[in-house]
Amino acid sequence: MIQVSTHLEVADNSGARIVKCIKVLGGSRRKYAALGDVIVVSIKEALPGTKVKKGETARAVVVRTAREYQRSDGSYIKFDGNSAVLINKEKEPIGTRIFGPVARELRAKKFMKIISLAPEVL
């Protein structure tokens, strides 16, 4: 469960390391984002000489959450931390590699490029 001001790790090689959620997309009164939801983030830490810079804003999709997420079959999934992958307006990842596992819920939300780049889908 991600809300405004939540800090997330970045799970790709776009150059950003830490981002902060500044908006949850999908409705004017929406408070929380779960697995597979798109958020607007501000880049707080970035490596020098990369595609994104500190202080820029970007869109990101949540790929891992520390809060457990209940699936339709009744099982739960949770991860050690909150992570996101930076995407462009066309919902394609900015980076060319994804680090760590991602949730299966991304497949239902049509993030196939992220699914194919991920080393493991849980």
Swiss-Prot record:
Database matches in CDD domains: Ribosomal_uL14
One Gene Ontology molecular-function label: large ribosomal subunit rRNA binding
A Pfam entry, by short name: Ribosomal_L14
Record bears the keyword rRNA-binding: yes
The keyword Ribonucleoprotein is assigned to this record: yes
Transmembrane segments: none
GO cellular component terms, semicolon-separated: cytosolic large ribosomal subunit
Keyword entries, A-Z: Ribonucleoprotein, Ribosomal protein, RNA-binding, rRNA-binding
GO biological process, one term: translation
PROSITE patterns: RIBOSOMAL_L14 (PS00049)
Family membership noted in the UniProt record: Belongs to the universal ribosomal protein uL14 family.
PANTHER family: 50S/60S RIBOSOMAL PROTEIN L14/L23, LARGE RIBOSOMAL SUBUNIT PROTEIN UL14M
HAMAP family for the chain: Ribosomal_uL14
Record's subunit section: Part of the 50S ribosomal subunit. Forms a cluster with proteins L3 and L19. In the 70S ribosome, L14 and L19 interact and together make contacts with the 16S rRNA in bridges B5 and B8.
Function per UniProt: Binds to 23S rRNA. Forms part of two intersubunit bridges in the 70S ribosome.
Official protein name in the record: Large ribosomal subunit protein uL14
Organism annotation: Sorangium cellulosum (strain So ce56) (Polyangium cellulosum (strain So ce56))
Record gene name: rplN
